[in-house]
């Protein structure tokens, strides 16, 4: 049985942000929707687009908050509280500056590392950091003053090709996570490099 009951993809809403690095979490959710044949539908009480599906006998909920990134914790906590999903049963997919393009890693717990979506998620979950994260590497611009503009821009073609391969591997690993557990998925994904 899957330890994960809720999979969240972070991003900013609207066409303006759809292809920006900060939306890497939503990119992966869209791939999972194709892989597992589900559609996300807007659900205002959860401030997001949601789906529910059964995979290998496990009921899994998916969420893409439709709030801006810095308010995404509200959507996560609303859905988790409503369905009585514990923080350690949540996987949050997000862009990660500290990993290069072509790398994605799963980990449990930790701080927010300056990521506003994670910062709000931790706060909205009552300062509980025990949720899992699937970190999609986007690289770092090299100067902290450039980070905001960097995450709100599209990756270069070279970076996108690497990110694309990491997203493919992450899609396979989420399938493993649901069917065979988080440890097996973590071991495989954390060893991958495009």
Curated annotation (Swiss-Prot):
EC number: 3.1.1.29
Keyword vocabulary terms for this entry: Cytoplasm, Hydrolase, RNA-binding, tRNA-binding
Main location (coarse class): cytoplasm
Pfam families linked to this entry: Pept_tRNA_hydro
Listed GO CC annotations: cytoplasm
Positions marked as site (Discriminates between blocked and unblocked aminoacyl-tRNA): 12
GO terms for biological process, alphabetical: protein quality control for misfolded or incompletely synthesized proteins; rescue of stalled ribosome
EC supergroup of this enzyme: hydrolase
Gene3D superfamilies named in the record: Peptidyl-tRNA hydrolase
Superkingdom of the source species: Bacteria
Coiled coil: none
Active site positions: 22
Tagged with keyword Cytoplasm: yes
SUPFAM superfamilies noted in UniProt: Peptidyl-tRNA hydrolase-like
Site residues (Stabilizes the basic form of H active site to accept a proton), renumbered to this chain: 95
UniProt-recorded Gene Ontology molecular function terms: peptidyl-tRNA hydrolase activity; tRNA binding
Subcellular location: Cytoplasm
Catalysed reactions, as listed in the record: an N-acyl-L-alpha-aminoacyl-tRNA + H2O = an N-acyl-L-amino acid + a tRNA + H(+)
The UniProt record lists the keyword tRNA-binding: yes
Residues the entry annotates as binding tRNA: 17, 68, 70, 116
Family as reported in the entry's similarity comment: Belongs to the PTH family.
Subunit structure: Monomer.
Biological role: Hydrolyzes ribosome-free peptidyl-tRNAs (with 1 or more amino acids incorporated), which drop off the ribosome during protein synthesis, or as a result of ribosome stalling. Catalyzes the release of premature peptidyl moieties from peptidyl-tRNA molecules trapped in stalled 50S ribosomal subunits, and thus maintains levels of free tRNAs and 50S ribosomes.
Protein name listed in UniProt: Peptidyl-tRNA hydrolase
Organism: Pasteurella multocida (strain Pm70)
Phylogenetic placement of the source organism: Bacteria, Pseudomonadati, Pseudomonadota, Gammaproteobacteria, Pasteurellales
